[in-house]
Swiss-Prot record:
Domain of life: Eukaryota
InterPro entries per the UniProt record, alphabetical: Hem25/SLC25A38, Mitochondrial_sb/sol_carrier, Mt_carrier_dom_sf
Keywords per UniProt: Membrane, Mitochondrion, Mitochondrion inner membrane, Repeat, Transmembrane, Transmembrane helix, Transport
Record field: catalytic activity: glycine(in) = glycine(out)
Protein name: Mitochondrial glycine transporter
Family annotation (Gene3D superfamilies): Mitochondrial carrier domain
Biological process, per Gene Ontology: glycine import into mitochondrion
Localization of this protein: Mitochondrion inner membrane
Similarity-based family: Belongs to the mitochondrial carrier (TC 2.A.29) family. SLC25A38 subfamily.
Phylogenetic lineage: Eukaryota, Fungi, Dikarya, Ascomycota, Pezizomycotina
GO MF, any single term: glycine transmembrane transporter activity
Solcar repeat locations: 22-106, 135-216, 228-312
GO cellular component: mitochondrial inner membrane; mitochondrion
Membrane topology according to the record: Multi-pass membrane protein
Amino acid sequence: MSNNASPQAAYVPAVKPVSKSSKTTFHFGAGLLSGLTSSILLQPADLLKTRVQQSAHPSSVFSTVKAILSSPNPVRNLWRGTLPSALRTGFGSALYFTSLNALRTSLASTSLTNYDADVKKIGNGSSALPKLSHSANLATGAAARVAAGFVMMPVTVLKVRYESDYYAYRSLYSAGRDIVRTEGVRGLFSGFGATAARDAPYAGLYVLFYEQLKRYLSATTSSTELPSSSSINFVSGGLAAGLATAITNPFDAVKTRLQLMPGKYGNMIRAVRLMVREDGVRSLFGGLGLRIGRKALSSALAWTVYEELILRAEMKWARDEAEARL
């Protein structure tokens, strides 16, 4: 029986191909857990970003925090909107990771992505996902994010309205009822254009930067003591999110205004014109520091948790398959 341990231990690095046939339900569950973890822990930062961006004259983070802390229930107010945020991020992440895995697995089986060349060139690294070319990383990340964003858009609108102090909604139900009554079902999709314009390039750039950073970190540490896959994923996730966030922040600022005041701003182009004319170019970068901080932490947490869950599950599935052949 002692001979069984060695083949299993040696087999671990070769479990990557199993990701092509990973159970969809497990990818959904891993994405859900990773999204819930990051959204609940980082809800105060998300709320602060919404409050800073909502004003025609964006207030400072310090003054916003001071106002919340001086309220009757500061801790509760910092986590205001946690339920819609957790629903949006949790199920949004589940849909996103499931779609992303399906797209990447499908593309990896074609000759369009140079899958084999990539694997031979850089090795398996710390990723639980199939390796793709730069353009495929960009395209799959963007497509999966926009699809998940559309499905979760009503929850996103409820979250933003509930977090804002523009509205006095006492519950998510009252918020949803008021939006449908005054704006129709269309109101639940306010700002989708700006959201898609933000999420598509953000997600595409994120996956591109994330995979490249993991390859770079794996290559630069290959001659020294190898760090754990989780540490490589965490650092890569944080850096990739910071870069992608800085590039796409104007779309996020516009999206927030559209979801809070759709009657005033109307559409994305009109919103940009009004914001620049009334508040200057700096309004397009309102909440940038908060968004970078939150996105860096949330993406690092979400992707690390997701990839570790998938890697461990696939190792187990691979061992089970190997044992079944004995």
